[in-house]
Design a protein with these regions (language model features):
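Structured, contiguous alpha/beta core segments that scaffold functional sites
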Residues: 2-67, 71-272, 377
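A contiguous, surface-oriented mixed alpha/beta subdomain in the mid-to-C-terminal portion of proteins
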Residues: 193-351, 361-366
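Leucine-centric amphipathic alpha-helical interface motifs
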Residues: 1-48, 165, 298, 321-378
């Protein structure tokens, strides 16, 4: 008895692609022949943190809010000696101490550290201070030499080398050789919260996965709007299977006209030899999906706030409680101010005191809830 076998060819198009997220770990690796230590795989950890801070809503809210708290209501600093800048101006470009502290505070919260570029005059006196974007910097193992590039992930990059900043008295500067002076005219002051490795770690490093989950949730909903994670329409062609070229052309025409976010879904195509061979789709259903999604969103947000030791209400993110009184807000702010804001302000103040070589050159007026209850940080 002869068995008649029919080969059924079915082609599907426009099925949504799998979105792969790549979490970069803060590994450190020295390369032979290179002076710097790589910061993450393919030198991409800083870039990864920057993108994460832009795309994870809760993380961005906490960073932005914390920066506002650190900068406070006002910042004053003594005039740089031997300069004609107006008070509060830090360089010939006109950067103010407030804008500079805002930038380094953002780096401190995003990466766990910050950097300043220090310019000296011929006598060795500091005459200019610039904010230096820490994510463009790489360093040797002990942070004595720094390398600046605006594209560390590319093979073709321009790299500028700088020495680490050291405080040198005018007397000692005069005793330096011309070569040593030339090397130290332009230097980098590199500041880290932790000193356990070459590069800093952000306070939320233990919650990076939660930040990534939150970003993926946003991507999920965007893709659901754009083209649907499950197709909203199946088109069966039951008059045989055409050539690959014909199928691709028909599928392309259909997708261009009918699919996308304006048509609330994507189209799935099925090519069949006859109607009896039409494609059958079984859609898996998840019970209580809404409750699971809500629980997941709540969990990841809480983990991010836990990493910062912060109360969500401080950043305009409501909790499940029925309310948040002024008294509770003030209490939460005072705790966060004590455990996170003032230590960051102290680190910044100590950095500028190191530059000037004396204490008391800079003060930060705290972010005011009730101004009379707060004292100036000096």
């Amino acid at each position: 008895m002869e068995n008649n076998k029919t080969t059924l060819r079915v082609s599907f198009a426009a099925i949504d692609p799998y979105i792969e997220t790549y979490i970069v770990s803060p590994t450190e690796k020295s390369q032979n022949g290179r002076g710097w230590v790589e910061w993450g795989e393919r030198n991409g950890y800083a870039d990864y943190l920057l993108e994460l801070s832009k795309q994870a809503p809760t993380l961005r809210a906490v960073i932005n809010g914390t920066v506002d708290f650190i900068v406070g209501d006002d910042i004053t600093i003594a005039q740089l000696p031997d300069t004609s800048y107006i008070p509060g101006v830090m360089n010939t470009r006109g950067d103010t101490i407030i804008s500079q502290v805002e930038s380094i505070a953002r780096d401190l919260e995003t990466y766990g550290g910050f950097a300043l570029q220090i310019i000296r005059n011929a006598l060795g006196k500091i005459v200019e201070v610039y904010y230096c974007d820490v994510h463009f910097l790489r360093s040797n193992k002990d942070n004595t030499v720094f390398y600046y590039s605006e594209n560390w992930t590319s093979g073709k990059r321009k790299i500028v080398e700088y020495p680490a900043f050291i405080h040198i008295s005018p007397e000692k500067w005069a005793s330096l050789s011309d070569e040593e002076k030339e090397r130290n005219y332009n230097s980098i002051l590199y500041v880290k919260r932790e000193h356990t490795q070459t590069y800093p770690l952000p306070v939320y490093c233990a919650a990076v996965k939660e930040c990534e989950i939150e970003r993926c949730i946003a991507d999920y909903h965007l893709n659901a709007i754009n083209n649907g994670f499950t197709s909203s329409l199946i088109v069966n062609f039951n008059n045989g299977v055409p050539t690959d070229e014909v199928r691709e052309e028909i599928e392309k025409d259909f997708n261009e006209k009918f699919s996308g976010h304006q048509n609330a879904g994507r189209i799935m195509f099925s090519w069949n030899d006859n109607k009896d061979a039409a494609t059958t789709i079984t859609e898996p259903k998840v019970e209580d999906f809404g409750d699971r999604y809500k629980a997941l969103s709540s969990h990841v947000r809480q983990q991010i706030f836990t990493a910062f030791r912060a109360n969500p209400n401080l950043f305009g993110i409501p909790t499940e409680s029925l309310g948040f009184s002024q008294e509770e807000y003030e209490s939460a702010f005072k705790l966060y101010n004590r455990t996170a804001i003032r230590p960051a302000q102290r680190l910044i103040i100590e950095t500028y005191e190191k530059l000037y070589g004396q204490p008391g050159v800079i003060s930060i007026t705290p972010f005011s809830l009730q101004a009379e209850t707060e004292k100036t940080v000096q």
